[in-house]
Amino acid sequence: MTLSPLKKLAIVLSTIFFLQGCIVAALGGGAAAAKVGTDPRTAGTQVDDETLEFKVENAVEKDAQIKNEGRINAVSYNGRVLLIGQVPNSGVKDTAADLAKGVEGVNDIYNELTIGPKISFAQISKDSWITTQVKSKMLVDGRVKATDVKVISENGEVFLLGTVTYAQADAAADIASKISGVKKVIKVFKYLN
């Protein structure tokens, strides 16, 4: 049985499409292992932080107004939780912080929620690109280890988390401030002596 060139092409493209998922899964698993190995936090602390982010977001979204009108992300580093996103008013902003504080394991809350409409998917994509650029610049800069700083971008604002020296914090902020599209850099560091 011979296959027409069009059928051969369809088979090849289908195979590539299905294998692409395997490649992404394999690379993702490798990236996760590398992250655990290079992050200064222990693997247990990293898992605790991921769990805490999930618990805080769940607790906050139990509020109907937040769930319907807000967009909130929780970012945790050593139990210190940063709230970012958009809410309709200051009352909802305060409610979100109060709900987050009530979650077991939360040591500190940094409420950086902004009052206004939810950002667009296009802005979310721009923020992801900003985060990628900041991390890449840190890798080549050398003044601060990129693995020591967690970088999150939200609506053009870059948030830097981690446990670093004052010099490293300043270097990280300097690097982030020079990236196109960055409106503001917010340091949420715990400082070493």
Name these PLM-found stretches.
Residues T2-K7, L13-N193:
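N-terminal targeting leaders
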